């Protein structure tokens, strides 16, 4: 995996505190597997091994399937992770961002987002409400925004 050698080099030259992978499904596996689910499983396992080798967290962003669009409650679930159940299995933590306002223009929760902690190997799961600041495309602490 080319990424592993780059990370090793960066760690030796500068140190490394965290690795961020923007869009896991754009990566390709080393085996040239024709089955995309198996390939994503291989990638997921190699990311887990990379985190252990580099002794740092790896944050990997993943695309969801279209399943949330088909449900009345559009909140994403673990089963919505695209192309592989191994992402769900291998990850220590899985979090989703959700804004009801995106799907429901009449919502009472305008300017509110949710961080859904769907899996946390060493802790609780649940939902944390946050302020959505659309002008800056960012989330913020709900208490801080509403007290300012």
Q: How would you name each of these model-derived features?
A:
Residues 24:
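Conserved Walker B
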Residues 1-18, 28, 33, 45-55, ...:
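C-terminal regions of RecA-like/P-loop NTPase motor modules
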Residues 33-36, 40:
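A short, small/polar-residue-rich loop/turn motif at beta-strand boundaries
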